[in-house]
Amino acid sequence: MGYDVTRFQGDVDEDLICPICSGVLEEPVQAPHCEHAFCNACITQWFSQQQTCPVDRSVVTVAHLRPVPRIMRNMLSKLQIACDNAVFGCSAVVRLDNLMSHLSDCEHNPKRPVTCEQGCGLEMPKDELPNHNCIKHLRSVVQQQQSRIAELEKTSAEHKHQLAEQKRDIQLLKAYMRAIRSVNPNLQNLEETIEYNEILEWVNSLQPARVTRWGGMISTPDAVLQAVIKRSLVESGCPASIVNELIENAHERSWPQGLATLETRQMNRRYYENYVAKRIPGKQAVVVMACENQHMGDDMVQEPGLVMIFAHGVEEI
């Protein structure tokens, strides 16, 4: 619906008046053939009843409507209009194209968001502030939080119970396997085969990597860095049976003879390009697994594998 003509200063050109609502055009559109202009809301409602121009009855549909020419939009934008909140005491008169920005900041706008300054900090429409009760609001907030906390505590208790049952089942299973293994030695071989297949599946899921700056190797990572790498290994699906061993092998104290000291690493540097390395996801680090590096000498690999951490220079192939 259009703007009330009485809100404007001076006379308004009749070409800027909507023939349907008799107000000044709001979001104007135009019928392309007869060039009659209407408020978008007015003509849309009109077309719900009939598909003709309200002025000359020529056939028109919503699909035919087009924006009004720029000159008409410019004429509308320059009109001076009184604020919507004049009835609430606002005396501002602004250009029509500035009306919306004025309304958002108008001190007299009853729906302008304001913040309670009595302590609760709730944001609400200005006209609701006189009837606002901080205690009532805060009581509602506390009740919602208490309800949420109760739900979380219930869920946490259920998870703890499930975890305890799973741990008990695992202990029983381990005891059962030990008992069976004492009777059937072949079970040990089966367990090792299953574990080896899990390791291979994990290794094959990692992206091949290339190290471009071997000189950036961190041979003595501290506990914090090791914990970060360990978390990434776990998140990548690394079998739990080898996680701790791999982290232990991230420090030069556990490296094989060919990597044990800076001098030997420099001497054997020409062999590094022969490593098959896999990227630890999201980190400047690689794993060099023994199962993929059997072509390397025993002095260059370690079971089940090595973790090499770098300051930079790790790229996925």
Swiss-Prot record:
It catalyses: S-ubiquitinyl-[E2 ubiquitin-conjugating enzyme]-L-cysteine + [acceptor protein]-L-lysine = [E2 ubiquitin-conjugating enzyme]-L-cysteine + N(6)-ubiquitinyl-[acceptor protein]-L-lysine. Its EC number is 2.3.2.27. A zinc finger (SIAH-type) spans 78-138. Coiled coil: none annotated. Autoubiquitinated. Autoubiquitination leads to proteasomal degradation. Deubiquitinated by USP8 to get stabilized which induces apoptosis. It is an enzyme of class 2 (transferase). It comes from the Eukaryota. Acts as E3 ubiquitin-protein ligase and regulates the degradation of target proteins. Polyubiquitinates MYD88. Negatively regulates MYD88-dependent production of pro-inflammatory cytokines. Can promote TRIF-dependent production of type I interferon and inhibits infection with vesicular stomatitis virus. Also promotes activation of TBK1 and IRF3. Involved in the ubiquitination of erythropoietin (EPO) and interleukin-3 (IL-3) receptors. This is E3 ubiquitin-protein ligase NRDP1. It comes from Mus musculus. The lineage of its organism: Eukaryota, Metazoa, Chordata, Craniata, Vertebrata. The gene is Rnf41.
